[in-house]
């Protein structure tokens, strides 16, 4: 079913994680009625007392446990937007988005604020008067993946 030119994917969540000075993390999720995020349904947070240290290329080890906690008991999700890459290189090495797709079984869009050293494949997206691009990748969305790879 299409809604406003976008596929209806059901409840969508955008998530992010903030790291605490104590070594823990706070994850936040915004739930929306559709992929346009025009109608917000709820907000949630979860705190983890400890998380893994950052390792380049292994970001998911640090980020996925807090995301798991904030998304717990949300069986109606149809789309997840994460702060990071779905895949880390053109060969498809899995990043946070691919790991989240495998974990939750739903399509994931990865939106990264900086270019990862091996990520030569994402299309930089600039919005409005911004000069800093966002780098978009996806997992579990073959049509979007083809569109991103083609530069459309």
Question: Positions of the model-derived regions?
Answer:
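Short, ordered loop/turn segments at secondary-structure junctions
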Residues: 85-86, 113-114
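Short, solvent-exposed loop/turn segments at secondary-structure junctions
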Residues: 88-91, 117-119
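Short Gly/Thr/Asp-enriched flexible loops that form oxyanion-binding sites at enzyme active sites
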Residues: 89-104
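Two-metal-ion RNase H-like nuclease active-site motif
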Residues: 10-20
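C-terminal binding/interaction regions
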Residues: 2-8, 42-44, 49-52, 64, ...
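Acidic, metal-ligating active-site segments
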Residues: 18, 23-39
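Structural motif
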Residues: 78-79
